[in-house]
Amino acid sequence: MPSRFSIRDSVPAFSTADCEHALFAAKWPEGFRCPRCGHPHYYEVSSRGRRLFECRSCSHQASLTAGTVLEGSRTPLTKWFQAMFLMQIGISARLLAELIDVTYKTAWLINHKLRHAIGEWDRERPLEGDLQLLGEYYGYEYHRYLGSLIVQQGLKPQPIVVGASLDGAGDIVHLKMKAVDGPEGDDAARRGGAGGEEAAERFVQKHVVGGGADDRAERLERGHRGPTALHIAWREAVRWLAWTFGGIGPKHLQAYLNEYCFRRLLCRNDMLAELIACCGTTKTITYRRLVGSRSGIRPIPWAYRRPARSGRRAG
């Protein structure tokens, strides 16, 4: 990852007017529509320094942030857009707080609200076409020198199904990584597999176009048999989680996996535009909902250990 100094220099100084224009286009891509009556025309008014859009038909006043991920936030739009820009890199809340000059709690909440929007984007885009599935675990230790994933004794890793749509050359077109929760996950841990055929079938049903059809079912492949595109993507995700966050607990693991897949699929320019678009059409999530308990996920420890230095330098 680039240094924080180079990251700071790369963050654009968004203007409030540019942010308002972009959010307006994201919220109403086909032009203004009153959220109450659907009328297409409005008067622009101001109240307590807020820009409002008053419907000419029913006089309902709509704000830019109402009904979006940004609703209820007192953080300036410019800082939100800087956070969206930095989501392209994939940084921690602690570094985000430093870069955009907000508290850690605010940075954490902004990042998770953006991940919430990404989760909705992911949910609306199922896999289709030629599929490949891979059964994996999160909760292994990554050894950067050996380039392998080493199981830790006594851990109960989180089973994961990695799925992708592939093109004719075998390259990933669309990618999903989904945690196997509840009884299926417990059963997978006991049997030493990532959910087996049951997890594969459920993944296909939930995340693949026409998932109920028998001819769409794919056999779940387990293990580290070769450097397939899915293996490489999974190891990149684990490496990013380890180096950036020191590992992620089970409660929010799925949100981080969604973020990784979103970023991997889109180039930087496309990602920022797509993130702004989905933020403008996704309803917000509250801090209480984010930190509340989530049933069906086993608590698992995450172990990450840097290998000891040998003391030798490369020549």
What are these regions (language model features)?
Residues 1-315:
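Residue-level recognition of single "structural anchor" positions
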